[in-house]
Design a protein with these regions (language model features):
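Conserved phosphate-binding/catalytic loops in two-lobed NTP-binding clefts
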Residues: 108-109, 293-316
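A contiguous, well-structured pocket-lining segment that forms one wall/lid of small-molecule binding clefts
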Residues: 69, 190-277, 286-295
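Glycine-rich phosphate-binding/hydrolytic loop that grips phosphoryl groups
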Residues: 115-117, 305-342
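Glycine-rich beta-strand-to-loop/alpha-helix junction loops that act as flexible
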Residues: 78-81, 98, 141, 277-286
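Glycine-rich phosphate-binding loop plus the immediately following alpha-helix
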Residues: 151-194, 218, 222-225
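Conserved phosphate-binding catalytic cores of ATP/NTP-utilizing and phosphoryl-transfer enzymes
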Residues: 109-135, 319
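Short beta-strand scaffold segments in enzyme catalytic cores
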Residues: 13-18, 137-139, 145-149
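N-terminal beta-alpha supersecondary unit
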Residues: 2-82, 93, 111, 115, ...
Length: 343
């Protein structure tokens, strides 16, 4: 079954083509990073308009990359939530029109479920074997930080989520405080690599399997102020002092966020007896997070390649395949659900 997946939940326009839920044929993505960088973050109205402009060209790129034509597509899948409501509406309406014109089945997909199934597209995963269920899934991005138990295809139980900022959002805010660019995750990681004496941050203590990053953000602001780095207009540190202080603060902040994510994930494994850990979402591209989980996980670790960690249409197509195989379909009344949950 050849599934075409469409992703427009935030600021990436993605169209992917996946055969049989496992074979990646195309993964075309139009990024809006440069558009939103001037604002220091994603502007919802701007994102929606950019999706309108990018969807048709991105669809054409995906079809060309896969070497297929639209009539060969067996089903159309689209992210219907969670996400920015305007961006979701653009994608959902485009998918409905496309499926209707082609006379093909339509399926709405949870964006977070898509991040889980990005791991099914990893070439190193044995195509003849399923990962061992249950899996503890850490889904960390700019909009979400959830710990979910996947007990089988389409079977999820929420173990914990962030009480305030998402991990990716925390990185974005930290980068802004330190005068770095957008998106913050790659910028923080790059600066952390230059650190000579990483600044220690307090350990995040939250009951259960929930997360919290607002305290770390406050600690960063105070330390940046003490170092004469923040607010930028009143910065008093010399250029050389600033560069060293920024790198050390970035390294300490990254260490604290990663440690919180790793500790809760491993605790989730201990509590549930899970047979594996799955990492998904934009933050899963962080090299330190991958390294720490690989070093400390007592069970197999499933991690998509970096290009599949960020938002894309291929992961939506992969997730849709397993639901379509069970006979699931949506009608033409499919709508956007910006607060949709998983588990």
């Amino acid at each position: 079954m050849l599934v075409l997946g469409i992703e427009t939940s935030c600021d990436e326009t993605g169209v992917g083509l996946v055969e049989g839920g496992r074979t990646l044929l195309a993964n075309a993505v139009a990024s809006q990073v440069e558009v939103h960088a001037r604002y220091g973050g994603v502007v919802p109205e701007v994102a929606s308009r950019q999706h309108v402009l990018a969807l048709v060209p991105t669809l054409h790129r995906a079809l060309q990359e896969a070497g297929v034509s639209l009539p060969q597509v067996d089903a159309v899948a689209v992210t219907c939530g969670p996400g920015l409501v305007g961006s979701l509406i653009v994608g959902v309406n485009f998918a409905k029109g496309l499926a209707m014109a082609l006379g093909k089945p339509l399926l709405g997909v949870n964006h977070l479920e898509g991040h889980i199934y990005a791991a099914w597209l990893e070439p190193t995963l044995d195509p003849e074997r399923e990962p061992g269920f249950p899996l503890v899934c850490l889904l960390a991005s700019g909009g979400h930080t959830d710990l979910v138990l996947m007990e089988g295809h389409g079977e999820y139980r929420l173990l914990g989520r962030t009480r305030d900022d998402a991990a990716g959002e925390a990185f974005d805010k930290a980068a802004r405080v330190l005068g770095l660019g957008f998106p913050g995750g790659p910028e923080i990681q790059r600066e952390a690599g230059r650190a000579t004496r990483p600044e220690p941050f307090p350990r995040v203590v939250v009951e259960g399997l929930a997360f919290s990053f607002s305290g770390l953000k406050t600690a960063l602001v105070r330390r940046a102020q003490a170092a004469g780095l923040y607010p930028p207009a009143g910065a008093s540190a010399s250029p050389s002092e600033s560069r060293e202080a920024v790198a050390n603060l970035a390294a300490g902040f990254q260490e604290a966020v990663v440690e919180a994510l790793v500790e809760k994930t491993l605790e989730g494994v201990r509590r549930t007896g899970a047979r594996g850990i799955l990492l998904g979402g934009g933050v899963s591209a962080n090299a330190l997070l991958r390294q720490r989980l690989q070093q400390r996980s007592p069970v197999p670790l499933l991690v998509p390649c970096p290009s599949l960690c960020t938002d894309n249409g291929a992961m939506i197509a992969a997730a849709a395949f397993f639901r379509l195989r069970r006979g699931e379909r949506h009608g033409w009344d499919l709508d956007a659900h910006p607060s949709l949950r998983l588990g």
